Amino acid sequence: MENMRFSLKALRINKGLRQTDLAVELGVSRKTVAAWENGKSYPAADKIDGICKALGVGYDNIKWKA
């Protein structure tokens, strides 16, 4: 069975979070979250675990834009 993968934005919206909510939880700016969602930058390793916890998913369930 293949793992289901969803975009960071879709997961955030599904969780009922605004970019600002996720940013505050992770200690980054809203613009940083927007850049991650748009594939303009990639989260640092120390933020990835927090993203997964905040969204309630594993790393393999997030479709990271390159």
Could you tell me what each predicted segment is?
Residues 31, 41, 60:
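Key DNA-contact positions within bacterial/archaeal DNA-binding proteins
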Residues 1-14:
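A short, Lys/Arg-rich alpha-helix, primarily the initiator
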Residues 16-35:
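Short alpha-helical DNA-recognition segment
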Residues 6, 17, 43-46:
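Residue-level signal for the short linker/turn that defines the boundary of a DNA-recognition helix
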Residues 13, 24, 53:
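Alpha-helical residues within the helix-turn-helix
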Residues 44-61:
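DNA major-groove recognition helix of helix-turn-helix/homeodomain DNA-binding modules
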Residues 11, 25, 36, 65:
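Residues in the recognition helix of alpha-helical DNA-binding motifs
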